[in-house]
Structure formats: structure tokens, C-alpha cells
């Protein structure tokens, strides 16, 4: 009976040790796009605030262009003709400095509470 209690205690200890390490991995996995859309309207592209490029060679398994429109995050295929053309247009605009899409920074692990992004403040007023 005493050996069963010792075995149970060792199993409980192993579970407790394993839990914190798996929680550290979850914030990275939850920020990756798991599906991409192959179609996107030009009207929606006009409302993009931020664009990020997700590569398939890092922490994420799928290549994607992440578009931030208001409070939504849209994952679009980087092979979409409309996205490629839109990215070229954004880079060519005089008021943008370089490309509007930035590479997603990999390797930064955040604590569970620090996963939330701060809202962005824009100087232009929305008609809505």
C-alpha cells in the first residue's frame, strides 16, 4: 500500500512539472494562423491597419499574410494575386516608409498575461 502511494505521488509530481512548460508554448501556437483565405476583397484591403508576414519555417506551420482590420485579424494566402498586387502598391506609396507588411518576429515567448496586444491609436477619424 505504501509503494502505491509513493507511485501516485511521483506521477502527481511529474504532471505538475510538465504543466508550466506546456503553458509557455501555448501563446506562440495560438498566435499563428492555422487557416488562410485565398480570396479577399479590395474594399477590405483599403481598411488594413497593419500587415504581418507569417513564415512557415518558424514557430508556425503555415505561410500567411496577417491583416489587421479594426479589431479583427485575417489570415490570407501569400500566394493570392490580389495580396501580391496590394503589397506592391503599398510599398510604392510615398506616404509609407518601406513595405507595410513586416515579418512576424519569432522566438519571443510571452507570459500568459502579456499575450494581449495594446490597441492602436490613429489620427484619422472613421466614418463609422
UniProtKB/Swiss-Prot annotation:
GO terms for biological process: antimicrobial humoral immune response mediated by antimicrobial peptide; cellular response to lipopolysaccharide; inflammatory response; neutrophil chemotaxis; positive regulation of cell-matrix adhesion. Disulfide bonds join 32-60, 33-75. The keyword Nucleus does not apply. The gene is CCL28. Residues 94-113 have a biased composition (Basic residues). One of its GO terms (cellular component) is extracellular space. PROSITE patterns: SMALL_CYTOKINES_CC (PS00472). Residues 1-24 form the signal peptide. Belongs to the intercrine beta (chemokine CC) family. The keyword Zinc-finger does not apply. It is found in: Secreted. This is C-C motif chemokine 28. One of its GO terms (molecular function) is CXCR chemokine receptor binding.
Amino acid at each position: 500500500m505504501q509503494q502505491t502511494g509513493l507511485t501516485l505521488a511521483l506521477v502527481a509530481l511529474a504532471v505538475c512539472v510538465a504543466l508550466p512548460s506546456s503553458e509557455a508554448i501555448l501563446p506562440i501556437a495560438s498566435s499563428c494562423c492555422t487557416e488562410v483565405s485565398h480570396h479577399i476583397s479590395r474594399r477590405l484591403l483599403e481598411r488594413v491597419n497593419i500587415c504581418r508576414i507569417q513564415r512557415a519555417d518558424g514557430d508556425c506551420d503555415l505561410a500567411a499574410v496577417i491583416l489587421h482590420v479594426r479589431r479583427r485579424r485575417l489570415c490570407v494566402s501569400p500566394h493570392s494575386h490580389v495580396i501580391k498586387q496590394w503589397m506592391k502598391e503599398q510599398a510604392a506609396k510615398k506616404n509609407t516608409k518601406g513595405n507595410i507588411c513586416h515579418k512576424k518576429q519569432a522566438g519571443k515567448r510571452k507570459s500568459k498575461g502579456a499575450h494581449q496586444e495594446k490597441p492602436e491609436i490613429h489620427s484619422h477619424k472613421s466614418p463609422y
